[in-house]
From Swiss-Prot:
Descriptive protein name: Formate--tetrahydrofolate ligase
UniProt-listed Enzyme Commission number(s): 6.3.4.3
Keywords noted in UniProt: ATP-binding, Ligase, Nucleotide-binding, One-carbon metabolism
Pathway listed: One-carbon metabolism; tetrahydrofolate interconversion
Lineage: Bacteria, Pseudomonadati, Bacteroidota, Bacteroidia, Bacteroidales
One biological process term in Gene Ontology: tetrahydrofolate interconversion
InterPro entries given in the database record: Formate_THF_ligase, Formate_THF_ligase_CS, P-loop_NTPase
Pfam families attached to this UniProt entry: FTHFS
Keyword Iron: no
Family of the protein in this entry: Belongs to the formate--tetrahydrofolate ligase family.
Organism, scientific name: Bacteroides thetaiotaomicron (strain ATCC 29148 / DSM 2079 / JCM 5827 / CCUG 10774 / NCTC 10582 / VPI-5482 / E50)
GO molecular function: ATP binding; formate-tetrahydrofolate ligase activity
The keyword Nucleotide-binding appears for this protein: yes
Length: 555
C-alpha cells in the first residue's frame, strides 16, 4: 500500500470554493488561503440548523504507543456517511508541530482517510498556532515590561503565574530564568515554557462564541497575585484589545477537504492530556450549520477527551451529541491485556480477552453521560478473523453496536457498514440529554473527586500543599463554579503511565492546580504529567526531508 503522503499527492484536489459550495457556503464568504484552504466567517453559524444537525463524537480506548487511529476513523466515518447519501462533515483539531516532529508524526488521518492538503495542515497551515503563540508571548513581554517600568513605584507581583509557550517539544525550556544580566534586561525571575496546545489562549480560542467573547476572556486571564493577594489580570495591563487583534483571523474556522473531496473543518488544537482536547466550538457549530451529520473527535481515550468534551465543551456551548463512537484496535486491547508492545501484532486471544476490560470500562463511563455507544474496530492487516470474531461476540454480549472500519485501506467504501450503523442507531436509539459528572455548584475538590472516582476508578484522592493553597485562592476569587480539566497521562486510567488495562482502587494525586480564569476552567495536574513534552530518542524529524521540492517523511 502507498504511504500516507503518496496517497495524499495522488488525490486531485478540488478548489476550496467548490468544496464550500458543495455544502452550501456562498463563494463570497470564502477567504482563500491558497487554492485548497480557506477561512470561513463564524457569522454563518445558524443556531436553528445546529439544533437539527446530528453531532457524533468519536473517542477511543485508552491510548497506547501503537496508536489507535481515531482521526482516521472520524474522517472515514464522514466519508462512509457521504457514500450512503448523507450530508456529512468532519470537524477536527489542528495538528501541533511538536508531535509531528517528535514521536507521533502527522495528525491528518491516514491511508485513504485523510484531510488534505496534508503537508500544509501538518505544518504551518493557516498560521493559527503562530497567532496563538504570538498572542500568548506578547502578554509575557507586556507583563515583564509593566513590572520593569513600575518597579520604581514599588509595584511588583508576589507570584507570576503566566508562563511562555512554543509549538515544539523541548524539555530544556520547562524551567528557565529570565532577566539575567544588567538591570536593563528586566526583572530576574523564574519562568518556563509550555507547548502551544496547552496555552490558555488556545483554550480561550476554542471555547469563545465570537470575537467579543474572545476579548472578554482574554481580559480575564489571571497573570499573578500582588503582595496583598489581589489577582492581577490582562485587564490590569490594559492590553486585551491588542491581544485580540493578534487573533482576529485565527478565530475564523478553517475549511479543507478529505481524500474524497468532502468538506472538513480543522480548527483549534488543545491536547487532551494537558488541556481540554477538543476543536473549537465555532468550527463544530459551523459544520453543524451546513451538515446533517457532523463527526468530531476528542483527544486520546474517553477518560480524557470525551470527559472534557461533555463536561467542558458541551456544558459551555449547549451541544448535545446524538451518539458516541468508541474506537478500539486489537493491538491496543492486547497491550491493555498485558501483551508487550513488540508482540501485539501476533495472535494472542488471552491478551485480547483481558484487554477488553479496558473497553468495557470506557463504555460504562460513556453511558454514565446518557450516551448511546457503538464500537468501531479499526482493522489492521495483522488482525486475525478469530480476533475480530471475539470482538464482535463481546459487543453483542454488551448490547453495543459494532462495525469494522476499513477506511484506512478502502476510504469511504471501507466505512459504509460503520456509517449505516451510526444512522440506524441515531434514528432508533439516540443518546439521552447529557448527564454531567458533576454540578456547577460542587466544590473544586468534589468535581475532581467525582471524575477521578466515578470515571477513572480511584479510591483515594490526595493533594499537595501547593494544590490545596490554589483551591483556597479559587474559593477566595469566587470561581468554584468553573469546570475542572484534569491533566494526566493518556496511557492509563490512573496517573501512572505504566499501569495499563482497567485499573481500579488506586491513589490519585493532584500535584498542582492552574487557574485558567480566561478559559473559565480549573486545570488540575495529576502525577508527573508535563505541559511541555520532550522529544523521543529517535524523533520523527530524523525521517522528514525535502527532495526536489517535495516533502518526505510526514505521515
Amino acid at each position: 500500500m502507498k504511504s500516507d503522503i503518496e496517497i495524499a499527492r495522488s488525490v486531485e484536489l478540488k478548489k476550496i470554493k467548490q468544496v464550500a459550495e458543495s455544502i452550501g457556503i456562498p463563494r463570497e464568504e470564502v477567504e482563500n488561503y491558497g487554492r485548497y484552504i480557506a477561512k470561513i466567517p463564524e457569522q454563518l453559524i445558524d443556531e436553528e440548523k445546529v439544533k437539527k444537525s446530528n453531532l457524533v463524537l468519536v473517542t477511543a480506548i485508552t491510548a497506547t504507543k501503537a496508536g489507535i487511529g481515531k482521526t482516521t476513523v472520524s474522517i472515514g466515518l464522514a466519508l462512509g456517511l457521504n457514500k450512503i447519501g448523507k450530508k456529512a462533515i468532519v470537524a477536527l483539531r489542528e495538528p501541533s508541530l511538536g508531535p509531528c516532529f517528535g514521536m507521533k508524526g502527522g495528525a491528518a488521518g491516514g491511508g485513504y482517510a485523510q484531510v488534505l492538503p496534508m503537508e500544509k495542515i501538518n505544518l504551518h497551515f493557516t498560521g493559527d498556532f503562530h497567532a496563538i503563540t504570538s498572542a500568548h508571548n506578547m502578554i509575557s513581554a507586556l507583563l515583564d515590561n509593566y513590572l520593569y517600568q513600575n518597579q520604581a513605584k514599588g509595584f511588583g507581583l508576589k507570584e507570576i503565574l503566566w508562563r511562555r509557550v512554543l509549538d515544539v517539544n523541548d524539555r530544556s525550556l520547562r524551567s528557565i530564568v529570565v532577566g539575567l544580566g544588567p538591570k536593563s534586561n528586566g526583572i530576574t525571575q523564574e519562568s518556563g515554557f509550555d507547548i502551544t496546545p496547552a496555552s490558555e489562549i488556545m483554550a480561550i480560542l476554542c471555547l469563545s462564541k465570537d470575537v467579543e467573547d474572545l476579548r472578554r476572556r482574554i481580559e480575564n486571564i489571571l497573570l499573578g497575585f500582588t503582595y496583598d493577594d489581589q489577582p492581577f489580570t490582562v485587564k490590569d495591563l490594559g492590553v486585551a484589545g491588542a491581544i485580540t487583534v493578534l487573533l482576529k483571523d485565527a478565530i475564523h474556522p478553517n475549511l479543507v477537504q478529505t481524500t474524497e473531496g468532502t468538506a472538513a473543518f480543522v480548527h483549534g488544537g488543545p491536547f487532551a492530556n494537558i488541556a481540554h482536547g477538543c476543536n473549537s466550538i465555532l468550527a463544530t457549530k459551523l459544520a453543524m450549520s451546513f451538515g446533517d451529520y457532523v463527526i468530531t473527535e476528542a483527544g486520546f481515550g474517553a477518560d480524557l477527551g470525551a470527559e472534557k468534551f461533555y463536561n467542558i465543551k458541551c456544558r459551555k456551548s449547549g451541544l448535545q451529541p446524538k451518539l458516541t463512537v468508541i474506537v478500539a484496535t486489537a493491538q491496543g486491547l492486547k497491550m491493555h491485556g498485558g501483551v508487550s508492545l513488540d508482540r501485539i501484532k501476533e495472535p494472542n486471544m488471552e491478551g485480547l480477552k483481558e484487554g477488553l476490560r479496558n473497553l468495557d470500562k470506557h463504555i460504562r463511563n460513556l453511558r454514565s453521560f446518557g450516551q448511546t455507544v457503538v464500537v468501531a474496530f479499526n482493522k489492521f492487516a495483522t488482525d486475525t478473523d478469530e480476533e475480530m470474531e471475539m470482538l464482535r461476540e463481546h459487543c453483542e454480549q454488551l448490547g453495543v453496536g459494532y462495525a469494522i472500519n476499513n477506511a484506512f485501506s478502502d476510504g469511504g467504501d471501507g466505512a459504509v457498514d460503520m456509517a449505516r450503523l451510526v444512522v440506524d442507531t441515531i434514528e432508533n436509539n439516540p443518546s439521552e440529554p447529557l448527564r454531567y459528572t458533576y454540578k456547577e455548584e460542587d466544590s473544586i475538590q468534589q468535581k475532581i473527586e467525582k471524575v477521578a472516582t466515578n470515571l477513572y476508578g480511584a479510591s483515594v484522592i490526595t493533594y499537595s500543599s501547593i494544590a490545596r493553597n490554589r483551591i483556597k485562592l479559587i474559593e477566595k476569587m469566587g470561581i468554584t463554579h468553573y469546570p475542572v480539566c484534569i491533566a494526566k497521562t493518556q496511557y492509563s486510567f490512573s496517573a501512572d503511565p505504566k499501569i495499563y488495562g482497567a485499573v481500579n482502587n488506586f491513589e490519585f494525586h493532584i500535584k498542582d492546580i492552574v487557574i485558567n480564569n480566561g478559559a473559565e476552567m480549573i486545570v488540575a495536574i495529576a502525577g508527573e504529567i508535563l505541559r511541555m513534552p520532550g522529544l523521543p530518542k529517535e524523533p520523527q524529524a530524523l525521517h522528514i526531508d525535502i527532495v526536489d521540492g517535495e516533502i518526505e517523511g510526514l505521515s
